[in-house]
Every structure is written in structure tokens, then in C-alpha cells.
């Protein structure tokens, strides 16, 4: 039997006890009472704190202090001792200066939504390993940034200064910056020297500033050889910027400016560019070949521009038709001239561009009558009008007629009501789908007023709804293949019609017309109508019987209650109701008399009428029921009831 020395046994016992107590010693690290600690993550956010609590564990790596009321005086000096902290979230607090006493090795600092005005070298030099700095929504201005404030931050990659008070780009930014956001400031000028050292910059956002072409130097972006994304949205540019870095630029955003022309060399050498957006500008045409160097373009957005589809834009149609399927071009819709407004540029044929050298005259054809629709004429847009030919009346519905060389679609329209138009069509060849578009005519349309839809090839009609009453509309259809590419040599078939006027389609008239148009499904009268008619006839018969019975009994009753009319022709009964005489009207049996009243009993302008009914309680009038049949029955005296004083 092997014996273990007692000393060795005691040593191993102590080691076991120490190992058992080790987890408890780690778990016993303190956590501020107002916070919650979870393995390096310290949550002290949303607690209305005015200062950072003390006693934060030394193993903390992420401090969540956002949405409090912490000010600069509330940052304790002991915070510098937390050497493992890498991320601090101090946004939405009450800081008015760049904070000090921050941990030295912090890499990501969020200070947005404070009121920070100044950025000094002393505050930034304490955090030399900073990689991301978020200062959005503060009050930083160009003069409040100390010269050389960032010279020790050689690891800074992201700098966000959106929505501040900057008028220029800060000087002396580190060369290591890869993303710079300066959107929604007051920047009006950018010198060529302010960005020349940022050779590692990949993303530059300058949206919502006051930049125009005079405030941009010709070579301001030239040295940004690693730039992949440039955004100049919501500025005041009148022309697309030139001399852009073409080595790596992939995204260019120029929408919501005042760009009215594009220099021919604006996009030269941008062979890596795959997304270009110039929507919401004032472009009416493009110089030929402006997109020739865009070898990798896949997304081109040109929405909401007043494109004039004249001869200068014919090359655009040819370029669009030569693009591969992967290229997505949006927004090239004609706004002028009038004859092609609302049509896609890629759908136009050569004759519609008004190029005199290529223009060929198309003979006007005669309208084909149709028995189902009103008299319809030809569509004036797709033909060349001769001086001696009158323009068709736009207040009627028209049927399209095209050259007999190519007749793919024939469209018919009919105004159903003040807000709806029924469209039907016939196709000469089988097709998978058709594109249907409509636009209100008679005025310069607002951007986006053209409505489009895709209908399947097996359909032959469509109902347009929610239209304006008594308004002209243009309707166009284009055949589509299964690959969703429009036929390159096919002109859209268009037609113009008008919704019905309001006076012709009031609710009652419309209902009656619809009822007249809709035939009965069965020739027999519905059972409900038969029952309703029978009930009405029975009710009328009963009502007539009751009226006859009342009339007969009333006549017999009035013969027993006849009274003398002799005195009523010249007495003062009628006068009593108009002169306001101070008298009493007394009726005894079949006669009556006026009894004067002394002035001391009743005031001067008053009278009192006492009615004394006959002892037998009978009516005084011969036919009392006849008075209820009219509002102006006449007495024997010839005076209407409205002129008598009733009691």
C-alpha cells in the first residue's frame, strides 16, 4: 500500500480550494448600481444620468452611455484607466466640447446629437488609436476646429460630420481617412488643396450643401485615386463635374441639382462606373457619345428630366437598343415635343425625331368605320399633316390608323363614364405581353403623371379608372417580347380620347343609361317585382276605400250640423282678425256677436277672443275635412284662410 505524505495532501487540498474559488472571484467584480454589466458590455444608457458612474469594471470593452444628460464635467478622470474599452456610445447627451479623460485605446467613438462646438488637439491626442469618429448633428464649424487637431490620429478611417455648421472642408485631415461624410452643412466652396492629401479616401458624401460649379475647382477630385463613391445630391450644380477620378469610381450620384447640360467629356475614362444617377434635374438632351466610356454601367437613372425628343436625342435611342440585357436604364421618357410626350425614347422610330435628312412623309389614311363605336378618325401624331387637311376633333374618340406597311395593334376606345374609359385592341401577331400607358393631355404634365402597366398577351381589353371628367387622354400600346425588350423597329400605337362631361353623366342619368344598356338575363319579370307590384295595388285599393268611407260619413254628418250663413256676409268677424279690436267674440248656438271691452280691462293694442262652443258640441263648419286637403282653402266671403284670424 502506497502512503501519501501528509504535507503533500495539504498542498493539493489548498490548490483545489483555490481553483474552486476562482470563478467566484471573477464574478465578484463590481458593477455600478445604475448600470447593468454583461461580460465587458456596460449598459448605462437611458437613465437620465448627468455624469458617468464610477466603479466601472476594468474588463469593460463597450460603454453604452447614450440618451442621458451627461455634460463635460460629468466625465470622471478615472475613466482613462479603462485600458480595454474600444467602443463608447455617448450620443444624445449634453456635451458642448469634445470630451476629455477618455480611455486611450478607444477605437470607435459616437458623439452625435450633442452640442459640441470645438475640436482641439489636446482632446484628440488623448485617443491616438481612434478609427471611427461620429460627430453628426453637432455645432462644429470650420473655424472651431483647431489647426492640426487630427495630426496624431493616424489610424482614423471614418469621420462623420453630417449636419453641422461647416462652410469648408476642414484642413489637416489624416491621410488614412477612407470615408468622409459632410452632408447637410453649408459648404459652398472646395479648394483643390483641401482634398489632395486624402489619397486613401473611398467614399465622399457632400449631399445637401451649397455647392455650384464655380465653387468646385476643376481638379478638386482628381487626386482621389481610390475614390469608389461620390455623392453630390441636393446641391446647386448646373453641369456635371469633370475631371473625376476614373481609376476606381463605381458610384456617382448627381440627382436633385439644377444640371441642364452635361459636358461631352464629363464621364470620360470612368470605365469602372456601374451606377450613375442624374434624376430630378433640368436635362433636355445629351451630347452624343457621352456614355461611350461607361463600359461597366449597369444602372443608369435619369428620371424626372424634361427630355426633348428631337433630332439631338436620336442617338440615345440607337444606344439604348444596342445595350445588353444587364443594363438597366430608367427615366428616358419624352416630355416634348407634344406629339411624342409620354412616350419612351427607345420606343420611337426615326420619323418621330424630326431629323430632316432622315424624315420621310407618311401618307394619311382614312378612318375605318366601326359599328360598335362612334365615328373615329386617324391619330395625327404618327403621320405628317398636309396643309389642306384639318386636324381631327379632339372631343371625340379616335381609332388609330397606321401605315399599311406595319399594322401590329389596332386600338379601340370608348368613354364609359366621367372617370372611366374602356380600351380594347386587336393584334395581328401573337405576343407574350403588351405595355399600356396613358397620359392626360392639354397641359404640360407634371413629372410622374404618366401611368404604365403590363398586360398579358391573352387579354384584349382594359378599363382605365380614376380619370378626370371631360379631359383628353392619350393612350399608347407597345408589343413586348418574352425577354422584356421592346421591338426595336415597332412604333407605339397611340390613340386620343376624352372622358364624358359631367352634365351628361349625373348619377341619375348614368344609372338609367346603364340599366338601359344591360339586357335582362331572363325574359320573365323577377318574382320580387311581381310581389312588390301586387302589394302596392292592394295598398292603393284599401286607401281608396277608406277615403270613400270617410267622405260619405262626413257628408251625412255635416247635414245635421248645418247653420245659418245669413249674418256672416256683413258682420265684423273677418275684421276682428285684422284690426286688433278690443272686443270679445261670442258664439251662441248658430249666431255670434261682438261685445266691446272697456279700455281699462285690456291694453290698447291687445284683444281677447273667447270661443263659446254650442251646447251640442257640434262643428260650426259644414265640411271640416275639406280644409285639410289644401293650405289655401277659401271661405264664402272669398277671402283666403290666411287672411282670417283663427281661434
Swiss-Prot record:
The keyword DNA-binding does not apply. GO terms for cellular component: axon terminus; axonal growth cone; cell-cell junction; cytosol; endoplasmic reticulum membrane; extracellular space; focal adhesion; glutamatergic synapse. Keywords: Cell adhesion, Cell junction, Cell membrane, Cell projection, Developmental protein, Disulfide bond, Endoplasmic reticulum, Glycoprotein, Leucine-rich repeat, Membrane, Repeat, Secreted, Signal, Transmembrane, Transmembrane helix. N-glycosylated. Proteolytic cleavage in the juxtamembrane region gives rise to a soluble ectodomain. Cleavage is probably effected by a metalloprotease. LRR repeats lie at residues 58-82, 83-105, 107-126, 127-152, 154-179, 181-197, 198-223, 225-246, 247-269, 270-293. Residues 30-62 form the LRRNT domain. GO terms for biological process: axon guidance; cell-cell adhesion via plasma-membrane adhesion molecules; embryonic morphogenesis; fibroblast growth factor receptor signaling pathway; head development; heart development; neuron projection development; neuron projection extension. It is a single-pass membrane protein. Residues 548-647 are cytoplasmic. Residues 404-502 form the Fibronectin type-III domain. Residues 305-356 form the LRRCT domain. This is Leucine-rich repeat transmembrane protein FLRT3. The gene is FLRT3.
Amino acid at each position: 500500500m502506497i502512503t501519501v505524505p501528509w504535507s503533500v495532501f495539504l498542498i493539493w487540498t489548498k490548490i483545489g480550494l483555490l481553483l474552486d474559488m476562482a470563478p467566484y472571484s471573477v464574478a465578484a467584480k463590481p458593477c455600478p448600481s445604475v448600470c447593468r454589466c454583461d461580460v465587458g458590455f456596460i449598459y448605462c444608457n437611458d437613465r437620465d444620468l448627468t455624469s458617468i458612474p464610477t466603479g466601472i469594471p476594468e474588463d469593460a470593452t463597450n460603454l453604452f452611455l447614450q440618451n442621458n444628460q451627461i455634460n463635460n464635467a460629468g466625465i470622471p478622470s478615472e475613466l482613462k484607466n479603462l485600458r480595454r474599452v474600444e467602443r463608447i456610445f455617448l450620443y444624445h447627451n449634453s456635451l458642448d466640447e469634445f470630451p476629455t479623460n477618455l480611455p486611450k485605446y478607444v477605437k470607435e467613438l459616437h458623439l452625435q446629437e450633442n452640442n459640441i462646438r470645438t475640436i482641439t488637439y489636446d482632446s484628440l491626442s488623448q485617443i491616438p488609436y481612434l478609427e471611427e469618429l461620429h460627430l453628426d448633428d453637432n455645432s462644429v464649424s470650420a473655424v472651431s476646429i483647431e489647426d492640426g487637431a487630427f495630426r496624431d490620429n493616424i489610424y482614423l478611417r471614418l469621420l462623420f460630420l453630417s449636419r453641422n455648421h461647416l462652410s469648408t472642408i476642414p484642413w489637416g485631415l489624416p491621410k488614412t481617412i477612407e470615408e468622409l461624410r459632410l452632408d447637410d452643412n453649408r459648404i459652398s466652396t472646395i479648394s483643390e488643396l483641401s482634398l489632395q492629401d486624402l489619397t486613401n479616401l473611398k467614399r465622399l458624401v457632400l449631399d445637401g450643401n451649397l455647392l455650384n460649379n464655380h465653387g468646385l475647382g476643376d481638379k478638386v477630385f482628381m487626386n482621389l485615386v481610390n475614390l469608389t463613391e461620390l455623392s453630390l445630391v441636393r446641391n446647386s450644380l448646373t453641369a456635371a463635374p469633370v475631371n473625376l477620378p476614373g481609376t476606381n469610381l463605381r458610384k456617382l450620384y448627381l440627382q436633385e441639382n439644377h444640371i441642364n447640360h452635361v459636358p461631352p467629356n464629363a464621364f470620360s475614362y470612368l470605365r469602372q462606373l456601374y451606377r450613375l444617377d442624374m434624376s430630378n434635374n433640368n436635362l433636355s438632351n445629351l451630347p452624343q457619345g457621352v456614355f461611350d466610356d461607361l463600359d461597366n454601367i449597369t444602372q443608369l437613372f435619369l428620371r424626372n428630366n424634361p427630355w426633348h425628343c428631337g433630332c439631338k436625342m436620336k442617338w440615345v435611342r440607337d444606344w439604348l437598343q444596342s445595350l445588353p440585357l444587364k443594363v438597366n436604364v430608367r427615366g428616358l421618357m419624352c416630355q416634348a415635343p407634344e406629339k411624342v410626350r409620354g412616350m419612351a425614347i427607345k420606343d420611337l422610330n426615326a420619323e418621330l425625331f424630326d431629323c430632316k435628312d432622315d424624315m420621310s412623309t407618311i401618307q394619311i389614311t382614312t378612318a375605318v368605320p366601326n359599328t360598335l363605336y362612334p365615328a373615329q378618325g386617324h391619330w395625327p401624331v404618327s403621320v405628317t399633316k398636309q396643309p389642306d387637311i384639318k386636324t381631327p376633333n379632339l372631343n371625340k374618340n379616335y381609332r388609330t390608323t397606321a401605315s399599311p406597311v406595319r399594322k401590329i395593334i389596332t386600338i379601340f376606345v370608348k368613354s364609359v363614364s366621367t372617370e372611366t374609359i374602356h380600351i380594347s385592341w386587336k393584334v395581328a401577331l401573337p405576343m407574350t405581353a403588351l405595355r399600356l400607358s396613358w397620359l392626360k393631355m392639354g397641359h404640360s404634365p407634371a413629372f410622374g403623371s404618366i401611368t404604365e402597366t403590363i398586360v398579358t398577351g391573352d387579354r384584349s381589353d382594359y378599363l382605365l379608372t380614376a380619370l378626370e371628367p371631360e379631359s383628353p387622354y392619350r393612350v399608347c400600346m407597345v408589343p413586348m417580347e418574352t425577354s422584356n425588350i421592346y421591338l426595336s423597329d415597332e412604333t407605339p400605337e397611340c390613340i386620343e380620347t376624352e372622358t364624358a362631361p359631367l352634365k351628361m353623366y349625373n348619377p341619375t342619368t348614368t344609372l338609367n343609361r346603364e340599366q338601359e344598356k344591360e339586357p335582362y338575363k331572363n325574359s320573365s319579370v323577377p318574382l320580387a317585382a311581381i310581389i312588390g307590384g301586387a302589394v302596392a295595388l292592394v295598398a292603393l285599393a284599401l286607401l281608396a276605400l277608406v277615403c270613400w268611407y270617410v267622405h260619405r260619413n262626413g257628408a251625412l254628418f255635416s247635414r245635421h250640423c248645418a247653420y245659418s250663413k245669413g249674418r256672416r256676409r256683413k258682420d265684423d268677424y273677418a275684421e276682428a282678425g285684422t284690426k286688433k279690436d278690443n272686443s270679445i267674440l261670442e258664439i251662441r248656438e248658430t249666431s255670434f256677436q261682438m261685445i266691446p271691452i272697456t279700455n281699462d280691462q285690456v291694453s290698447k293694442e291687445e284683444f281677447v277672443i273667447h270661443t263659446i262652443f254650442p251646447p251640442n258640441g257640434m262643428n260650426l263648419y259644414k265640411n271640416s275635412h275639406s280644409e285639410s286637403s289644401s293650405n289655401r282653402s277659401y271661405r264664402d266671403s272669398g277671402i283666403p284662410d290666411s287672411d282670417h284670424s283663427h281661434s
